[in-house]
Structure formats: structure tokens, C-alpha cells
């Protein structure tokens, strides 16, 4: 990538970069100390202060449904897929209502509110000013009609009427903010974007498509070469700082970092001053300009120096942008990140959760990081524990999820408890982000609990989190089953299986087979064995229902054998025998252990005919232990002379078939 025209200088240290701002802050603080203190006569309360006070008196109810579903408790979802479908359906209905009201506002003019409440009345989203005029252009800009605004601007120029600088800057704001694309409405997507997605899906193999995080510019779209924003900017007879800053921010937002720095160079050549938002955008784009880590940092420092020279005071987002860019600066970023935090404190700028999130990103790169470097999370929690935060940076919502990932990689349950306590403090739970981020946070927390805690504590959290706050995926339920196995609490498996069905994971093959393996591994007391048998029958019914489910379960030799063994141990001989018949139908071969288990059940029931039928089944499968099976029947069962002859014939037929198969294999080798 071509380097911008900005001249970079070498930087020796960064501790005094923003000392100018520190001095200004101290000067203002000294001046303020001589001012008179004006004590207000009354305290101003927020409009929802009473509701907030009432909310603090109520703790979380793990049995209550999500607040989104309070209106329809009957339709409250029980699975993650139902949650997604319900929430999307509700939001779709709300957006559809907004669309109808916005499209036909004349049908909703009955104002019954006294006094008048403007927000309850429909907004007029259709243009009212006709013709080619600057007023019509302002209206299209206000309505966020990108294409119509550009067309109207061109018509004004062709008619010899140039819009004012203020109006042109507003148009430039609109085009740069949306990347010269129509904004995505509430219930519709741009036809061009839909076509791009469709073309991409047709040309790419979904199996070979890499699963990785994309840049923000890739999600938003790229900055097209010579788009309307650049064209209008070049057509402007006069430009002010706002014109340059708008174009720079748009280019940086949509991934055209090199162009953004070129425009910034033009801004400086015109002796104009950039605002703090523009510097923030350039700092975020700086790592994309340079290749080496030290060059990336030098460019960031150069921008900070320009802020000092242009008397632009940094804000919280400035320092967060520096920390976010430092995440791309390799090992050298650790010391620089701490210096950045010290600069924030010197300027009396309170860090936000995004600040600490970027700090974790700088110091913690993965589970293989040295232990001493990962203790930064403990120090962060020491500083922010017990505090209440508000949303001050869009990246604030990523802190809890990423911090819990650090706890999981470190397998530090105490840190996880401290983090969760912070999340429960005041209104901090409102900074969890969307449903995906919340589910990721609770999933990692529950995974760590299953690895590190006893089963009693795990079940306590299980009842508190599920399903009121978290719908576990199949991986989470597997972790719970492994925890039950480690603490030898297999008696809880029947109840957990009911939860698995309710949550909607009964069609996950790995999960179903893990349940069967745990139940069939050891012989349990009769009462528990009977419960296992009922669970095995329930699982068997899932394999038989194939028309009403999208993902049908297919019998494997292991699942067939486990269900057969569980039914035999539970005394359900008829059902167990039917399961043995399914082996041949499913083209599977029963194991020796399954046949021994079934023969033991036949011995308990003193059912000689069933034992002989089992030997006949083994002969049909040409199992190597058929002779031992027949010998065991003759020794352990009371057989008649006719039955003995039958068993001997079965042994002879098995021996002859075995010898013929071995001779054929020898001839094949010759």
C-alpha cells in the first residue's frame, strides 16, 4: 500500500506527548478553584429515576421468562432457535408497523393524546417539496435519500445554481456516512447488496469458505473508487475543514485508509484544522498504512503531535482508538498501552469498559501467553470492581465476553466469579451487548464452572442461568454430562436428558450417544437402572421419528448396542430383543458385550428359548464368539435334549462357515 504524504518523524518517548493538555487541564482546575460554588436549590432527577429505584429492589428471578416475552408467556421460547425465531418475528412485526405508518402517514392522523405527544404520531417520510431547488435537496438529505439527493445536486449544478457550502457539506456527510449507498431500512435491504450476497454464495463453496472475523470495512462495504463523495468534493468551489473531515472519516470507515491520509495531507496544506473525530478515525486507520510495528506506532504518535499543534483536545474515543490500534503493533504494544493509560489519567479522562477490553487484547493473545502477562485481568478487576458503568464507547459491549474468555483460557474460576459479580453490579448487565454476545459470555462461564467446580455448585448455577438467561448449546450440555461423570452423579442423567429435549438438542448425535454411553458403561442399582431403561426407550423413539424432523438420527452400532444393553438391564426383554433385530435392518453388527449382556438377562429370566434365539442371531452375523455363546447356554441353562442338539448343530454350522471363510481368504492371498 502506498504511503501517505504525511512526513513521519522518529519518536523517542511518549510520556510527554500530551503534556500540553495536562497543563491546560491543571490551569483550568486552578481557575475553577477560585470560582464561587453555586449550590442548586433542588436536585434534578431523571424521568425514570423512580422506575430505576424500584428495579434495584428486585433481584433476578431464574424462573421468570425474558422481559421480551412477558406479554405472551404461552409463547415463551424453550430453545435457542425458538428464542431467535420469536425475537425476530416480534421485531419484524414492529418494523412492519413502522413501515406502514411511515408509508401511509395520512391514515394515522387521529391524535387522542392530551397533551399532544409528537413521538406517537407518524413521521412524514415522503418528500413534500417538489421541483429542483436547494430546499428540496435539504429535504432529501433529511430523509436520508442518498441517490435522490445526489441526482438533485447534479440537476442544481446543471441549472447553474450551486448549493450553499452548508448544504453541500450536509450532502457530503450523508454520502460519506453510508459509503455512497442507500441506507438499509428497517424491513428491507438494498437490492444491490442482496445481489452481491447472492452472487458470492453462488460462486463460493460453503464448505471451503473460511470462518473468520471480518473487518468492519468488509461488513459495511468498501469505499468505491471515484464515488459520488469524491466527485462532489472535487466539484466544490470552496471547502472548509468540515468538508475535509467528513471525507476523511468516510474513507477511514470504509477501509480506504491510504486515501484518507492523502486527504488529511491536503487539509494540512490548506492550513485547516481537523476535529477530534477525524483524528480518531485516522488513528484507527494508521495500522493499515504501515507494515512494521514501530512504523505503525510512529504514525500514531505523529497524529497525536498534530493534535497538540492544532490545539485539539483528545477525548475518551481518542485513547481507545490508540489502544485498539496498538493491538496490531505486536509485542512492543504492552509498554505503550500502559503509557496510554497513564496519559488518560493525567488528563482526567475516565476509562470505559472498551479501554480495558483493548488493554486485555494487547496483553493477552491466547492460552499460550506467559502467566505473568495474563495477570493484567486481575489488576483490571482490582481497579473497576464494584463500579457502575454506562455506555460511552460502542466497543464497551465486548469487555465482559472477552474477559470471560481470558478466565476460561486461564481456567481461573475465582477471576470468573469476580467478573460475574462486576457484571451484576448496578446496570452493568445492560452492557452485555446483543443476544450472541450474552450467550457467548454465559456459555464460557458455564464451561469454566463445569471444568473447575463440584457438581452441586454447577447445578446451582445451572438452575440460575438456564433457561432464563442462557440457552446452552450442545457443547455446554456435553460439559455438564462430563461433570456428572467426574463427580459420579449419573443418577441425574434422566433429568438432564429431559432438559436436553426441552432445550432442543435431542437431535444432536454426539450428545445423544454421550448420554447412552454414560448410562450403559456401568451396571447401576435396580431403581436407577429402571430409570435408565425409560430414558433409553425415549431416545429410541427419537430414532424412529424421521418424517417430522429436519435432522433425522441414524442408528450406529454403538447406539444400538447401548440401547439394547440398557433395556436388557432394566428387564425390558421384549423391547431389547426388538432392538437386536434392528442390527440387521440397519446393517450393523452387535458387539460381544451386547450379546453377553442379553444372555445374562435371559439367565435371570430363566428363558432358555430366548438364549437359543440369541445364539441363532450370532450365527447369522458370523460372530467369532458364537461357539462360546452356545457353550455358555448349554452350561448355564437347563436345556432339553432337542435344544442341546440344536445348539450343537449351530456350533457345527458356525465352525464350517468359519473354516470356509478362512480358506477363501487364504486362497485370495495366494
Curated annotation (Swiss-Prot):
Stretch forming the transit peptide: 1-13
Name of one Pfam family that matches: Rib_mS39_PPR
PPR repeat boundaries on the chain: 129-163, 164-199, 209-239, 240-274, 275-314, 315-351, 352-392, 396-430, 438-472, 473-507, 556-590
GO terms of biological process kind: mitochondrial translation; regulation of translation
Biased composition (Low complexity): 653-670
Comp. bias regions, Acidic residues: 193-203
Keyword annotations of the record: Mitochondrion, Repeat, Ribonucleoprotein, Ribosomal protein, RNA-binding, rRNA-binding, Transit peptide, Translation regulation
Record has Disulfide bond as a keyword: no
Subcellular location as annotated: Mitochondrion
Region of interest (Disordered), residue spans: 187-213, 648-670
A GO cellular component entry from the record: mitochondrion
Molecular function per GO: ribosomal small subunit binding; rRNA binding
Disulfide partners: none
Family statement drawn from the similarity comment of this UniProt entry: Belongs to the mitochondrion-specific ribosomal protein mS39 family.
Known function: Mitochondrial protein that may have a role in mitochondrial translation.
Protein name in the entry: Small ribosomal subunit protein mS39
Organism: Xenopus tropicalis (Western clawed frog)
Amino acid at each position: 500500500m502506498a504511503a501517505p504524504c504525511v512526513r513521519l518523524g522518529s519518536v523517542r518517548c511518549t510520556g510527554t506527548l500530551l503534556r500540553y493538555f495536562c497543563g491546560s487541564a491543571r490551569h483550568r482546575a486552578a481557575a475553577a478553584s477560585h470560582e464561587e460554588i453555586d449550590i442548586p436549590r433542588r436536585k434534578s432527577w431523571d424521568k425514570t429515576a423512580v422506575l430505576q429505584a424500584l428495579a434495584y429492589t428486585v433481584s433476578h428471578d431464574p424462573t421468570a421468562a425474558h422481559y421480551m416475552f412477558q406479554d405472551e408467556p404461552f409463547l415463551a421460547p424453550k430453545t435457542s432457535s425458538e428464542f431467535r425465531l420469536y425475537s425476530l418475528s416480534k421485531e419484524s412485526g414492529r418494523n412492519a408497523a413502522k413501515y406502514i405508518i411511515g408509508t401511509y402517514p395520512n391514515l394515522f392522523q387521529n391524535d387522542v393524546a392530551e397533551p399532544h405527544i409528537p413521538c406517537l404520531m407518524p413521521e412524514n417520510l415522503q418528500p413534500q417539496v417538489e421541483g429542483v431547488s436547494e430546499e428540496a435537496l435539504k429535504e432529501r438529505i433529511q430523509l436520508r435519500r442518498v441517490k435522490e439527493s445526489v441526482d438533485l445536486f447534479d440537476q442544481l449544478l446543471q441549472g447553474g445554481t450551486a448549493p450553499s457550502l452548508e448544504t453541500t457539506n450536509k450532502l457530503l456527510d450523508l454520502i460519506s456516512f453510508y459509503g455512497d449507498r442507500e441506507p438499509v431500512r428497517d424491513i428491507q435491504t438494498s437490492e444491490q447488496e442482496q445481489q452481491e450476497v447472492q452472487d458470492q454464495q453462488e460462486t463460493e463453496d460453503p464448505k471451503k469458505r473460511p470462518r473468520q472475523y471480518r473487518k468492519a470495512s468488509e461488513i459495511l462495504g468498501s469505499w468505491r473508487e471515484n464515488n459520488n463523495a469524491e466527485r462532489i468534493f472535487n466539484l466544490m468551489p470552496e471547502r472548509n475543514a468540515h468538508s475535509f473531515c467528513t471525507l476523511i472519516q468516510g474513507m477511514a470507515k470504509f477501509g480506504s485508509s491510504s486515501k484518507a491520509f492523502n486527504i488529511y495531507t491536503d487539509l494540512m496544506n490548506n492550513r485547516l484544522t481537523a476535529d477530534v473525530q477525524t483524528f480518531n478515525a485516522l488513528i484507527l486507520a494508521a495500522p493499515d498504512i504501515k507494515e512494521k510495528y514501530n512504523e505503525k506506532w510512529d504514525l500514531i504518535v505523529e497524529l497525536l503531535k498534530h493534535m497538540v499543534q492544532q490545539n485539539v483536545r483528545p477525548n475518551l474515543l481518542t485513547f481507545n482508538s490508540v489502544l485498539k490500534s496498538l493491538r496490531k503493533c505486536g509485542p512492543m504494544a504492552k509498554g505503550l498501552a500502559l503509557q496510554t493509560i497513564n496519559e488518560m489519567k493525567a488528563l482526567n479522562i475516565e476509562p470505559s469498559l472498551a479501554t480495558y477490553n483493548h488493554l486485555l487484547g494487547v496483553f493477552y493473545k491466547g492460552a499460550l501467553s506467559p502467566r505473568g502477562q495474563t495477570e493484567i485481568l486481575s489488576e483490571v478487576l482490582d481497579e473497576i470492581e464494584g463500579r457502575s458503568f454506562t455506555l460511552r464507547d460502542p466497543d464497551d459491549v465486548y469487555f465482559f465476553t472477552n474477559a470471560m474468555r481470558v478466565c476460561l483460557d486461564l481456567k481461573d474460576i475465582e477471576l470468573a466469579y469476580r467478573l460475574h459479580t462486576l457484571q451484576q453490579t448496578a446496570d452493568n448487565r445492560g452492557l452485555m451487548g446483543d443476544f450472541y454476545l450474552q450467550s457467548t459470555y454465559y456459555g464460557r462461564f458455564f464451561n469454566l464452572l463445569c471444568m473447575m467446580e463440584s457438581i452441586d455448585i454447577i447445578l446451582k448455577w445451572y438452575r440460575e442461568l438456564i433457561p432464563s438467561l442462557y440457552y446452552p448449546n450442545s457443547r455446554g450440555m456435553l460439559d455438564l454430562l462430563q461433570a456428572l461423570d467426574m463427580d459420579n452423579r449419573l443418577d441425574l442423567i434422566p433429568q438432564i436428558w429431559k432438559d436436553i429435549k426441552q432445550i432442543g438438542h435431542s437431535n444432536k448425535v454426539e450428545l445423544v450417544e454421550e448420554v447412552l454411553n454414560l448410562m450403559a458403561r456401568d451396571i447401576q442399582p435396580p431403581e436407577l437402572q429402571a430409570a435408565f431403561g425409560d430414558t433409553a426407550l425415549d431416545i429410541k423413539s427419537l430414532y424412529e421419528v424421521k418424517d417430522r424432523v429436519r435432522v433425522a438420527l441414524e442408528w450406529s452400532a454403538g447406539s444400538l448396542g447401548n440401547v439394547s444393553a440398557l433395556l436388557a438391564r432394566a428387564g425390558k426383554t421384549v423391547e431389547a430383543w426388538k432392538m437386536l433385530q434392528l442390527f440387521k435392518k440397519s446393517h450393523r453388527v452387535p458387539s460381544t458385550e451386547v450379546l453377553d449382556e442379553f444372555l445374562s438377562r435371559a439367565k435371570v429370566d430363566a428363558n432358555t428359548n430366548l438364549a437359543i434365539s440369541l445364539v441363532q442371531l450370532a450365527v447369522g452375523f458370523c460372530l467369532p464368539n458364537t461357539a462360546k455363546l452356545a457353550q455358555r447356554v448349554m452350561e448355564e441353562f437347563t436345556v432339553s435334549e432337542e435344544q442341546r442338539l440344536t445348539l450343537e448343530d449351530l456350533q457345527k454350522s458356525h465352525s464350517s462357515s468359519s473354516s470356509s471363510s478362512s480358506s477363501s481368504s487364504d486362497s485370495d492371498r495366494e
